[in-house]
């Protein structure tokens, strides 16, 4: 009971076709918008911290830029990430250089009255 022929079914063989790398990259970018959202939020909070001198906005900007950096890919632009970090760090530094008193949470004034 020995078979001399090839037992594999040639009509069932499916050849490997590599996917287009640019299409995969575009699909991966559109799947996760979190770094871009955090970058925009970081910029907004940095501007609020610099212009309105709100210390908690400056710290939120730093947190948002850290989250944005943690979720970025290697294909993303490094200049945008560095500028976001520099803006948020400068907001924290400037808010404490202008007024070195400790941060007062906004809800403290609501609890006192």
From Swiss-Prot:
Protein origin, superkingdom: Eukaryota
Cystine bridges: none
Protein name: Protein Asterix
A single BP term in Gene Ontology: protein insertion into ER membrane
Principal location listed in the UniProt entry: membrane
Membrane topology: Single-pass membrane protein
Family label: Belongs to the Asterix family.
One GO cellular component term: endoplasmic reticulum membrane
GO molecular function: protein folding chaperone
Keywords from the named record: Membrane, Transmembrane, Transmembrane helix
TM regions (residue ranges): 81-97
InterPro entries to which the protein is assigned, alphabetical: ASTER (IPR005351)
Subcellular location: Membrane
């Amino acid at each position: 009971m020995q078979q001399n022929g090839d037992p594999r079914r040639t009509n069932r063989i499916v050849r490997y076709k590599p996917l287009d790398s640019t299409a995969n990259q575009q699909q991966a970018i559109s799947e996760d918008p979190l770094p871009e959202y955090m970058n925009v939020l970081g910029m907004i909070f940095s501007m609020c911290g610099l212009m309105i001198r709100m210390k908690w906005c400056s710290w939120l900007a730093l947190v948002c830029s850290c989250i944005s950096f943690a979720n970025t890919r290697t294909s993303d632009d490094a200049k945008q990430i560095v500028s976001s970090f520099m803006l948020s760090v400068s907001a924290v530094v400037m808010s404490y250089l202008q007024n070195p008193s400790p941060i007062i949470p906004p809800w403290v004034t609501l609890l006192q009255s």
